[in-house]
Swiss-Prot record:
Organism placement in taxonomy: Eukaryota, Metazoa, Chordata, Craniata, Vertebrata
Tissue specificity annotation: Expressed in heart, placenta, liver, pancreas and with a higher level in skeletal muscle.
Start-end of C2H2-type zinc fingers: 170-192, 198-220, 226-248, 254-276, 282-304, 310-332, 338-360, 366-388, 394-416, 422-444, 450-472
Protein's name according to its UniProt entry: Zinc finger protein 383
Function: May function as a transcriptional repressor, suppressing transcriptional activities mediated by MAPK signaling pathways.
Single GO cellular component term: nuclear membrane
GO aspect biological process, one term: regulation of transcription by RNA polymerase II
Amino acid sequence: MAEGSVMFSDVSIDFSQEEWDCLDPVQRDLYRDVMLENYGNLVSMGLYTPKPQVISLLEQGKEPWMVGRELTRGLCSDLESMCETKLLSLKKEVYEIELCQREIMGLTKHGLEYSSFGDVLEYRSHLAKQLGYPNGHFSQEIFTPEYMPTFIQQTFLTLHQIINNEDRPYECKKCGKAFSQNSQFIQHQRIHIGEKSYECKECGKFFSCGSHVTRHLKIHTGEKPFECKECGKAFSCSSYLSQHQRIHTGKKPYECKECGKAFSYCSNLIDHQRIHTGEKPYECKVCGKAFTKSSQLFQHARIHTGEKPYECKECGKAFTQSSKLVQHQRIHTGEKPYECKECGKAFSSGSALTNHQRIHTGEKPYDCKECGKAFTQSSQLRQHQRIHAGEKPFECLECGKAFTQNSQLFQHQRIHTDEKPYECNECGKAFNKCSNLTRHLRIHTGEKPYNCKECGKAFSSGSDLIRHQGIHTNK
């Protein structure tokens, strides 16, 4: 290889497992991007063909410290047999080289601090001379700084910044987040100003930085190279895998200083803190309603657009949220995973269980400010408030009759369609309301749950009891 060339070992930095564990997911992604980009640059320049194991591991989403690469590998076969190296510790900015056969070589351990990449090359030249290479070069030549391509000069600066995360001079005045590089700072600011200049050619969606487009493209390709060893679930990027693994470890590193509640994800902590501050930064431009999360605003916007992208394959019913579709599908499957510990009754959704549990606790947290009546569910309160407001938003298109509840309109429309979906298994008689079928079944069972407190007479329906009570009041 001619002088002025560069090898992969010259643009690669190794981490021990301890050093790797100190990096957060963002730092690991940055390291991975730099290493893969540099290898790609070498290949495109025709300088390096065999794929190093560390590159294969990074492409598979595995940890790079699994490769115990000697510093001298690929430089000289004689040197490989005589020496072994300690992994580079960037955190201390010290390159430590330990020679195995000190007695033969007459060399001792060297611990030198380097201020530039050129110093590394100078020390390698010094080491080569002591090993018997008069020109200060190994049998396979190393490039010199003046011939160094620009992308390689940036490599060690970038990797240095990965470790020295305290050196972040670029601070965002909006949110206080700090960055080590001006380019990262500029990309971050696009979040606040809403600038999205990177477009996905598949669907036309825009992003604030190029790496987000790369990650987004995996949605279209279905590529999920990062797999969880615990459960086999795969992800499109390594940071998602890192976050997912906290489910198995139970790790919740993000703690709220107000109440002490801890979270697995930083984004969850940020959302939670808005409960304490009352901040709702995401406002709907159509109706002015504000939300604590951008996802809530995104879902809310579908009310105005009428968009329902989540469709049930069984019956064709569509929903604005994927969670609503999941709940709906349990109607078809009969799945009820949420069980009440008090009575054993099971429900298809967690919210339905929460509402049910209030029967046992007697809790009615939703109070009407008009009359003081309390309800177990917020939807019940909203329906009740329409009585005071005189609001009847659900109108029948056939006859113009209006109702306070959508379910009332739905039942009313069966009068026009003559639909009677509730059939008695005893006699085959059908009804347009479930309550009418329930009342009818008492004819067959003889059940009379409504008792008169005056005379003790029992009735099968509440309306029959009310009519009977008129006898006592007219006396």
